[in-house]
Amino acid sequence: VSWVKKLLILSLLMIVFGIISIAGIYFYLKDDLPDVTTLQDVRLQTPMQVFTADGELISQFGEKRRIPLKLEEMPPLLIEAFLAVEDTRFYEHPGIDIIGIFRAVTVVASSGDFSQGASTITQQLARNFFLSREKKIVRKIKEIFLAIHIEQLLTKDQILELYLNKIELGQRSFGVGAAAQVYFGKTVHELTVDEIAIIAGLPKAPSALNPVRSASNARARRNVVLGRMLETRVIDKAAYDLAIAAPVTSRLHGAQITASAPYIAEMVRQDMVNRFGEETAYSAGLQVFTTIQSKQQAEAKHALQQNLYDYDERHGYRGPVAELWQSTLIEAENAEHKFEQEDPLSAEEILAYLDKQSSIEDLRSAIITAVHEQSADAIIAGGQEVTLQWDGLKWARTVQTDERQGVAPKTAFAIVKPGQHVLLRQQNDQWRLSQVPQASSAIVAIDPHNGAIRSLVGGYSFSQSQFNRVTQAKRQVGSNIKPFIYSAALEHGHTLATIMNDAPIHQWDSNAGIAWRPKNSPAVYDGPIRVREALAKSKNVVSVRLLRAVGIDNIITHLQRFGFTPSDLPRNETLSLGSASLTPLELVTGYAVFANGGYLVTPYVIEKILSEEGELLYQHNPVAACQGCDTTPAEQQTAEQPGDAEAQLDQLFNTLSLDTPLNQQDIAEQSVKQAEQVISEQNSFLIADALKSSVWGGGSWQHGTGWNGTAWRVQRLKRRDISAKTGTTNDSKDTWFSGFTPDLAVTVWVGFDDANRSLGRALWHANMGQQQSAGTESGARTALPAWLTYMETALPQYPEQPANTPVGLSSVRIDLQTGLLTNRTDHTSAFEYFKPGTEPKQYATANIQQISFDKAQDKKQDEEEVELF
C-alpha cells in the first residue's frame, strides 16, 4: 500500500512539475510567439491574372502559383485523402495529437532520431504561416503552442481550408487548386483517385515526391496514401486496385491561357509592377481586365503571322534547319530510291532528337524520311508520320538575294532530302513546308471614340523577341504621313478641289551639292490634279508642293496636334514624303483623329482592376471623342478627375489600399471626360472622305476617265465607311497600311528589325499561278493583306455607318478637270465638299485651269539623283 501511495504522490508531483514546466516554457517563449489573430484576415499570396475584356485569361504573373478555393469547392475525396495521410483525428484533437507526440518522444528517446513526425494539420498550418521547417525541439514546442491558439481562434473547417490553400506542393504550386493545374492541367473536380493520392502525398517532401521531378518517388508515396485511404475506408478495394495500377503520368502545365496576347500581358505586367512593386503585383491576387477583344486579338495574330509566312514564301526557301545524316541524289529508274543515305538514324533516335526541339508558334519540327516525285514523307515530334503534298512544297524556290529568287522547282527532289530537319505548319488542313520568318510586323487596332486598344500584336513571336514593335519601334512612315500634310493644307486655304501640278520636281540643293528629285511611285505624272485625287493616288510631288505652299513651320505645328513629337518630325521637305519616324501606336492614334471628328484620344489597355475577392479597385475613365455629350472638357478636369490614365492610376494607388473597393457612387460620379479637339470636325470629315477615294477611286470607267486609289483592294470588304492609306519608304524598308471606320482604327507595319534592310522584290513564280503577289514590296502588297484579313473578322461586329456631313460644310458640283463650278451633270462633274467660304467662285470654261504651282523654278541639272519615298 505504501508503494502505491508513493507512486501516486510521485505521479502528482510529476504532473505538477509538468504543468509548471509547460507554463514556464510558455512564458519563456511567449514574447517570441507570432500573433495568430492575423489568420483571421489572412491574404494568401495569389498571382496576378490578366484578362481580355470578355473574360478570357491572357496571362498569369507571380512567383507562387495558387488557385484559392473554398472548402465547399473542394471534392470530399480530396479532403479525406489529406486527412487519411496527414491527420486522421483532425476533427477530434485540440490542435495537437497526444498519441503522435508520445510516439515521436519514444523514438527520440530510443534512437535520437528527430525525423519522426507527429504534426497535426493545425501544427503544419502554424509552421507554414509562422515558423521554419527545421526539426528542432524549440520550434516544435512553439508549433504546439501556436496550434492550440489557432484551434481557439478558428473553426476546424477554417483551419482545413487555410491549410489546403497554403500548403507547399512543389514546382512553385501552393494549395491543392494550383497543384491540380500544375501537375495535371485539371481543376480539383477533374482529378482521378490516383491523382488525388499523388497530390495528398506531396506535403511530406514536395520537391522530392512530385511526379514531374521523380515518377518513381511519386508512385511509391501515392501507394502509401492509397493504402491509408483504403485503411480508413475513404475508398473501397475496387477503387484502390484501379488507382494503384494507374501509371504516373505528369508534366508541368501553365495557367490555362485562353487568349494569346503576350505583348499586351507584358505591357500590363510592367505597368502594375511600376505602380505596386513586384511583391504586391505578383502576390495580391489582382485581376486586371484589359480592353482587348479576344476574337479580334486571335485574328490579329493570325493575320500578322500568315502575312509574314506569305512574304517569306514569296522570297524563297532558305533551306533546312539541320541535316541529321547525308543523303545523295542518284539517278535511278525507281523514283522511290533516288537518294543514297549515309548512316540514317533509327526511328527511336529521330524521336529522341525531335523531343529536344522547342516549338516556335505554330511551326512543328519534322525529319524528312522519304522523298517522292512531288511529295515527301516526314515524322514530327510524338511520332506522327505526315505527307507533304506538292501544294505544300512547290513554293520553295531558293533564296538568292532580297531582290532575286531561284527558278521554280519541278520536283520535290530539288527541295528536300531524307535526314533534313525542317519546319512544317498546317494550312487548310494540309501540311506545308515552312520556316521562321525573318521579316517583322506589328498590328494595332484602337477604338477611335476613347482610345481603347482592341488588338495588339508586337511581332511574330513573343518567345523569340519581347521587343514590342507597336509601342517601341519608331520607323519612317512613308506615305502614311500624307493625310496629316493634306489636313494642314486644308487649314491653310486649300480645298479638296484645289488643282495642283503633278509634275516632276528638280531642285538643286546647294548645301548638299546634289539635285533633289522627289519622284512619284510609280513614276507616273498626271499634270493638273485635284487635291482629293492626289491624296487617293498618293502623289509624292503634290505632297511636296503642298508642304511648300503651307510652310514647314505650319506643317510641323499642325502635325503636333495629332500627338506627334516634334523631334520625330524632320524640319525639311522630306517630311512631306514620310521621313518622320513614328511607332504604329502613335500613327494609329493620329488616324483616330480623322475617324472621330477631330479629337485626340489617349490609347489605353487597362479597363479595370479587381481584388482577389472580385471587388472593383479601379475603373478607367478615358477621355472620349463625344460630340454633343454631357462631358467635362479635359482642360477643366479637377485634381479628383485626372485627364489621363497615368494620372488616374497614380491617384488610385495613392489614395486607395488594395482592401478599399470603389463603390457604385464612386463609379457613377466619374463623368465622361471629353478629349481635346485638335482639328475641326469639318477638317477630319474632309480627310476621311478623301481617303475613301483611296479605296473607291473616281472618274468614269465607262468613259475612259476612271482611276483607282492605292487602297483599291479594300473594296473587297464591300463597305463605304472605310478610309485607308498605304505607306512605303525608300527601297521598301518599311511598308504600312492604315485604315479606319468611325468605330475602329487599325495600322499594320511590315519591315525588318534591321532598318537598313529592304523588303526587296519577289519575282514571278511559275508554280504559283495568277493569284500570286509579285513585284516590289510596298504598303499595298506587303502590309495591306494583313490589314484586310484582320478587318474581315473585326468589322462585322461594327455596323456600317452612314456619312454624317458636319454642320457648316457645303456640297457643290464641280468640274473634275478644273475643280471649278459647273452646270454639267455628266461624268465630267461630281459633288465636292467645302468649308464655308472656300467654295469656287468661277465656272469652268474650256480655257480656265486653277493650278497651284510651287514658286521654286525647276533647275535642269544633271547632278546625282536622290530617290525618295
List where the protein language model places each region.
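Short active-site loop at a secondary-structure junction
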Residues: I67-E72, E403-F413, V436-S441, Q464-F484, ...
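Short, well-structured active-site flanking segments
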Residues: Y91-I101, F174-G177, D236-D241, L490-S510, ...
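Mid-domain, small-residue-enriched loop/turn segments at the edges of structured enzyme/sensor domains
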Residues: I514-K519, G551-T589
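A penicillin-recognizing enzyme superfamily signal
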Residues: L78, T290, S294-Q297, K301-A303, ...
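Non-catalytic, structured segments within soluble enzyme domains
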Residues: I22, D113-I379, L546, Q560-R561, ...
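Active-site SXXK
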Residues: F82-L83, M229, A300, E373, ...
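Conserved catalytic neighborhood of penicillin-recognizing serine enzymes
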Residues: S110-K135, H189, Q256-S260, H449, ...
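N-terminal type II signal-anchor transmembrane helix
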Residues: V1-F51, R89, V108-A109
